[in-house]
Structures are given as C-alpha cells and as structure tokens.
Regions:
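Mobile genetic element proteins and their domesticated derivatives, centered on retroelements
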Residues: 1, 27, 57, 74, ...
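C-terminal reverse transcriptase regions that engage the nucleic-acid substrate
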Residues: 1-44
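Two-metal-ion RNase H-like nuclease active-site motif
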Residues: 47-67
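Short, flexible loop/turn elements at secondary-structure junctions
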Residues: 57-62, 76-81, 91, 131-133, ...
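A short, polar/acidic, helix/strand-boundary loop motif
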Residues: 77-107, 115, 133, 138-150
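RNase H catalytic domain
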Residues: 113-179, 186
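Flexible, low-complexity interdomain linkers flanking nucleic-acid-processing modules
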Residues: 183-193
Length: 193
C-alpha cells in the first residue's frame, strides 16, 4: 500500500513489550489530561485500545557525511490488533539540499498521517515527533516560517475530510526517546527484520 510514494512494510503481529505498552498508556493519560484542544476536539478522547500511534522522524543532510542514508521513517503501532508497521524512504540529494530538518520531518509525518487516515478511518491517531518545531506547527496548523507553510497547507488538506470522524493528537517526545524512528530515518533496519 502506498500514498504519495510512501510504502509501508508490515512488521507483523507481535507482542508489545511491557515498557512500550506502559509508555503508550502514559501518552494516552497525558492526552486525556492536557490543556488545549486537539484536531476534531468534539470527538471523544482516545483510549489505549481505540487508537493508532505514529512515531515520525526524518534525517537531514549531515555536513560531514554526504554518503550515508538520509530519509523519512515512521512506525505505526495498533494496540487493538497488536500490529506494527514501519516505513522508510530515502530523500534525494536535491531535497536534502533544499529543505531543513523540520521541513523534512513534517513532510514525512504528513505522508504517514495521510496513509493512516485513509487506511483506518475513524480511529483516533496519536502522532509523536521528536522535533519541537514540527510538533508545535502540526498541532496549530500554523507556523512562523515561510518554508513550512506548504506543509501546513498540505496537512490542512489531509485533515479536512476527517474533521467530523477522526481526532488527531500530536505530541512531542524528547529526541532520546525517539530512537526507534531515528533508526528508520537512517535505514538502520537490520535489528528489526
């Protein structure tokens, strides 16, 4: 299955570790008690078994290393069916030279979000970014950076058809806690396959 060139690989139906399940339950608790309104705020807040978790990352151009893999990567965790999907897609050098890391992060996140909304309509989505600027922009659908406006417009177009059916909650996690998505964005897949 693909959306906008995004291809997902199914990692299979596997048990979540106790630590992963605890982390997801903590995220749900935080969402249920956070101040502010998520996208489609008239809908019920998500419960652990009634949502999908997306974790995004993008690796931009490394000045001292022009040869290593740089791309976008996302994990999709579905607690109800205990399925895990992953995607990773390399960025062409032209894109790496023209876009900064927050732009790449939002581009990757928007494509994965679009895929999840189409594939699992009506299921609450919890997105996790390790980039604070990407998180803030995605939550508000607005930014102060002209370079990110195209991603906000794309995201609005993606979300609009789901306004009455699907809530999307976007949160920030410390970079050190997002290492799984970081490994995908750098194509470090050996330990997952």
């Amino acid at each position: 299955s693909s959306v906008g060139g995004l291809t997902l690989r199914k990692s299979g139906q596997v048990p979540f570790s106790y630590q992963a399940e605890d982390a997801f339950r903590t995220i749900i608790y935080a969402i249920q008690h956070e101040i502010g309104r998520p996208f489609a705020s008239d809908l019920a807040l998500p419960a652990y078994n009634d949502c999908i978790f997306l974790m995004h990352d993008a690796a931009g151009l490394a000045e001292d290393d022009l040869e290593s893999y740089r791309g976008g990567g996302s994990w999709i965790w579905i607690p109800a069916s205990r399925q895990i999907f992953m995607t990773t897609s390399g960025f062409p050098m032209s894109l790496l030279r023209s876009e900064h890391s927050t732009s790449l992060e939002l581009m990757n996140g928007n494509l994965t979000l679009e895929y999840a909304l189409r594939r699992w309509p009506g299921v609450a989505i919890v997105e996790i970014y390790d980039n604070q600027a990407a998180t803030a922009s995605a939550r508000r659908l607005a930014c102060h950076s002209d370079s990110l406006n195209k991603h906000m417009a794309y995201r609005r177009d993606v979300l609009l058809p789901y306004l009455r059916t699907t809530s999307v909650h976007t949160i920030w996690a410390q970079r050190e806690l997002g290492t799984l998505a970081d490994m995908l964005s750098k194509n470090e897949l050996a330990q997952f396959l």
